[in-house]
């Protein structure tokens, strides 16, 4: 008598619910009421970008009017957009009365 047990073949399935969610961009929009120093500090605090990356992003938003500062899940992108909106005015500019603006767009 053999002690070997043979199990039936099991077909592997990919559950549709486990597919990754599509990525979204957090896009910072330019304005004239915030300094490069403000942008660099905000990007460092909210996204962990080093000062060099923050400076490059500040240059791009100043030149083109917008810059992608993060690509992530929709939920995190919305949170980061809201954090940008709540970051507060630039204390270096007396005329500055509020935060910068940002939007969320599909990355595709």
Question: Where are the regions a protein language model picked out?
Answer:
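Terminal domain-initiation and capping elements
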Residues: 1-108
């Amino acid at each position: 008598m053999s002690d070997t047990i043979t199990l039936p073949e099991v077909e592997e399935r990919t559950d549709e619910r486990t597919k990754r969610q599509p990525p979204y961009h957090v896009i910072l929009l330019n304005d004239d009421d915030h300094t490069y120093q403000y942008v660099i500090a905000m990007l460092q605090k909210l996204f962990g970008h080093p000062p060099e990356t923050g400076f490059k992003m500040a240059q791009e938003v100043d030149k083109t009017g917008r810059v992608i500062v993060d690509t992530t899940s929709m939920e995190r992108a919305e949170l980061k957009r809201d954090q940008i909106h709540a970051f507060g005015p630039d204390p270096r500019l007396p005329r500055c009365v509020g935060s910068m603006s940002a939007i969320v767009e599909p990355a595709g």
